[in-house]
Amino acid sequence: MDSTPLPVCRLHKSRSHKVCKEFSGYSKNSMGFYYGIKLQLITDIDGIPLSLQFTTTKTGDRDWLEQETQTTFKDCGYLFVGDKGYCGVEFHKKILNTGNYLLTGIKRSKKATLPLALWQLQLLKLRARIETCFDKLKDYYNLVSTKARSPLGYQLNWIISIFSLVVGW
């Protein structure tokens, strides 16, 4: 599970951008600032999407995952593998209370206290598959396109890109 930014226009054109003004916003990630929305995605071990949602930039990844585990994946017994942004004892307990499990990497400040087992390290290496899924969506299936002239055009482009990924898998 992870999220990726979907810019709807370039940052310097964001003030005059009117098409997606209702659901777009400013945010920052490791690559810098952007104006757009976020795609939240949960995939299985093969990289096939199980759940996805387009959210505003203000929606936190942890909030979305908590909502998904309480509705879609309640009492399923899934093992979710996430990055270090999903760390936290209280958050792990919330996910465990929904009947699911959460495996995350260990932050640098906690590395001396909690060693991971070999199978956990191998599962964390599989997390790169969701990044590959995002790369395919953006590079091959043109998920990030700023050529649409209406909100429906953006949504149609996003749906076609995700459908192409699922069918092409």
Put a short name on every predicted segment.
Residues 1-84, 88-97, 107-108:
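Polybasic low-complexity intrinsically disordered regions
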Residues 58, 88, 127-130, 156, ...:
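A structural signal for well-ordered alpha-helical scaffolds and beta->alpha junctions
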Residues 153-169:
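Charged phosphate-binding loop/patch that engages nucleotide di/tri-phosphates or the phosphate backbone
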Residues 79, 84-150:
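Helix-centered, glycine/charged polyanion-binding patches within enzymatic domains
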Residues 29-32, 147-158:
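Structural motif
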Residues 62-65, 134, 160:
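A general structural signal for well-ordered alpha-helical segments in protein cores
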Residues 7-13, 113-115, 157:
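Short, solvent-exposed polar/charged micro-motifs at secondary-structure junctions
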